[in-house]
Amino acid sequence: MTWLPLNPIPLKDRVSMIFLQYGQIDVIDGAFVLIDKTGIRTHIPVGSVACIMLEPGTRVSHAAVRLAAQVGTLLVWVGEAGVRVYASGQPGGARSDKLLYQAKLALDEDLRLKVVRKMFELRFGEPAPARRSVEQLRGIEGSRVRATYALLAKQYGVTWNGRRYDPKDWEKGDTINQCISAATSCLYGVTEAAILAAGYAPAIGFVHTGKPLSFVYDIADIIKFDTVVPKAFEIARRNPGEPDREVRLACRDIFRSSKTLAKLIPLIEDVLAAGEIQPPAPPEDAQPVAIPLPVSLGDAGHRSS
């Protein structure tokens, strides 16, 4: 019989991510394990991880997917080095009230503009220019992003020829583009886990639209130049033999030291609140969020259970 905790571990208290490759993922004696070709088992603490990135060479059993869903852990099927996302398994947190709230903000042009302006302000530390449309703000953002990449390249002494990479061919990109791709992939994974845990839809974006992870890109872009992208340039400067591995380890440390997972859901709520509309109350029979926060006693002298 599979043992499960009474409540999933809150997202903010979890390890950010784990990358797995070349093995069969299954549940044996109640444990989530990776079995390699020689039969060696590696235990994976599935309930204490925000998302598990599954690289080429992995096969996942029904029991493993079921256990991951029960403990609120996101499974993401990615390409080599995590530079391409093929699919993800939602851990069961989406709710109609949250989705309708998000969709209303995205479908109303005035509300959408308010949200985009808030994203701009959070990303660049200053209010968005007045009387600009979403398309115009997107253009201003793109120009600033290109300038930021060039500035980081100069700061770290890295040759920069622009953001150029082929997601179908990892080896084709130069070292800096490989590092950036690996870093942003890590950030996208934990951001998607946070969005799903909060009950929202990764596909309903505001700046980005028409992609399965549009909202993921929106939220991740707010913090990527304060977290993972500078580290990608720092690692690329050393020209390591395994840039993707070094970047992943560095990102994991950044997420832990900066408490990224603890900040993501409040950031998501702050961005959506810019629309200045009241979120609908959940129905009485609404499904609870995938990873609920522990109930506090309301006394600073007591710890929540």
Swiss-Prot record:
Effect seen on changing residue 221 to A: No cleavage of any substrates. Loss of spacer acquisition in vivo. No cleavage of CRISPR leader in preparation for spacer integration
Chain segments carrying region Disordered: 278-305
UniProt-recorded Gene Ontology molecular function terms: 5'-flap endonuclease activity; crossover junction DNA endonuclease activity; DNA binding; endonuclease activity; identical protein binding; metal ion binding; protein homodimerization activity
The protein's Enzyme Commission number: 3.1.-.-
Cofactor note: Protospacer integration in vitro also occurs with Mn(2+) and also requires low concentrations of KCl. The transesterification function works equally well with Mg(2+), Mn(2+) or Co(2+) in vitro.
Impact upon substituting residue 248 to E: Dramatically decreased spacer acquisition in vivo
Region span, Sufficient for cleavage of ssRNA, ssDNA and Holliday junction DNA: 96-278
Domain of life per record: Bacteria
Effect after changing residue 245 to D: Decreased spacer acquisition
InterPro entries: Cas1, Cas1_I-E, CRISPR-assoc_Cas1, CRISPR-assoc_Cas1_C, CRISPR-assoc_Cas1_ECOLI, CRISPR-assoc_Cas1_N
Positions annotated to bind Mg(2+): 141, 208, 221
Enzyme class: hydrolase
Entry domain remark: Substrate DNA-binding induces large structural changes that generate a surface for DNA-binding across the Cas2 dimer and formation of an optimal catalytic site.
UniProt protein name: CRISPR-associated endonuclease Cas1
Source organism: Escherichia coli (strain K12)
